[in-house]
Amino acid sequence: MLDVALELDDAGRLIYRDVTLSIPRQQGKSTLLLVLWVTRCLLWPDQRVVYTAQSGLDARKKWAGDWLPLLAASPFAGLMTVHRQSGHERVVWANGSRQSLVATTARAGHGDSLDLAVLDEAFAHPDGRIEQALRPAMMTRSQPQFWTVSTAGTPDSSPFLFDKVTRGREIAAAGVTEGVAYFEWAATDDADPGDPATWGSCMPALGITVTAATVQADFESMERHEFERAFLNLWTA
């Protein structure tokens, strides 16, 4: 999907300013986001990239526990300097680009200009205050993107994400090919949740990093609505 989300027009500018990704859990989302922000930092100089998740602590755990070890073992290690001080975590690249973490508050991103903002685990946010805080920081940048990424929640507890998904589906159905990009992997509402064919229809990592045996075991042990939300990316009550 990155080849579409990062598509350029004839002038070499990003076609999409807003990207929403709705996908089941454990389907490669974290790896995709790592590739996204590293690509953005290296493709152009002096980029300002921020990442946040359901909480500042969760964002730091993803950043320090998952992403930094992969980068340290990669060919990119010599191109970056990592700052780990709490509240000032960032990766600074040799070309002047910088990736950092932001708090999950209405003041997130204030005072900075941003090229890419990623709001992960958006189901945990009841409203759009983080987006409202970060969007203005993109106004003066030539190629800004705001990413909203998550597994489904419930309409009552995740109205911000539910609105994003609803509008994204409408935009996709209308055939819009600029401005907003919407990607969703989910089972249909009438699909049999225990059928391996249903799992294969919405779980891109099935058979790669996730086994059918694991999914079967979780299907048998979990509450049905929780399984449908986490594994099939279905909105449940």
Tell me the role of every PLM-derived stretch.
Residues 1-237:
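Phosphate/NTP-binding elements of NTP-utilizing enzymes
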